[in-house]
Regions:
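Negatively charged, low-complexity tracts enriched in Asp/Glu with abundant Ser/Thr
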Residues: 1-22
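Short, compositionally biased leader-like segments
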Residues: 21-29
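A general structural signal for short secondary-structure boundary/capping elements
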Residues: 25, 37, 80-85, 100
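Short aromatic-glycine-(Arg/Gly/Cys) micro-motifs in beta-strand/loop hairpins
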Residues: 28-62
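A signal for specific C-terminal beta-sheet/loop modules enriched in small/flexible residues
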Residues: 55-66, 89-94
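A short, charged, amphipathic alpha-helix used as a generic interaction element across diverse proteins
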Residues: 60-64, 69-84
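Charge-dense polyanion-binding interfaces
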Residues: 85-104
Length: 104
């Protein structure tokens, strides 16, 4: 499981380092939503962290862009990423914005 270098963290998340450790161990957590990037569809998606319990995600771990305390907060984080993308690049291509440093 990989985490984005500038991980987006929602305001309701009290201890992101502890949550990261627990996610790496596939611990069952309540009220933790993940903003993920999957290479296959080149989109950001919101999942409850319990989705990681499925075998598919153990073989194909997602790239985690952000952690939120609710689905609504995760959507707000995606909106914030979109606003940053438009202000810095003039485009709403979130994936290109998030990974532009890695391509340079």
């Amino acid at each position: 499981m990989k985490f984005y270098k500038n991980l987006y963290v929602g305001d309701t998340i009290k201890n992101p380092a502890k949550i990261r450790r627990k996610l790496k161990k596939y611990a069952k957590l309540n009220n933790v939503y993940l903003i993920t990037y999957m290479e296959e569809n080149r989109q950001l998606e919101i999942y409850h962290c319990l989705m990681l319990q499925q075998y598919y995600y153990k073989d194909n771990p997602p790239y985690i862009i952000g952690i939120a305390g609710s689905q609504e907060e995760a959507a707000q984080i995606i909106c914030r990423i979109a606003e940053e993308s438009v202000s810095k690049t003039g485009k709403a291509d979130l994936v290109e914005y998030l990974f532009m440093d890695e391509r340079s």
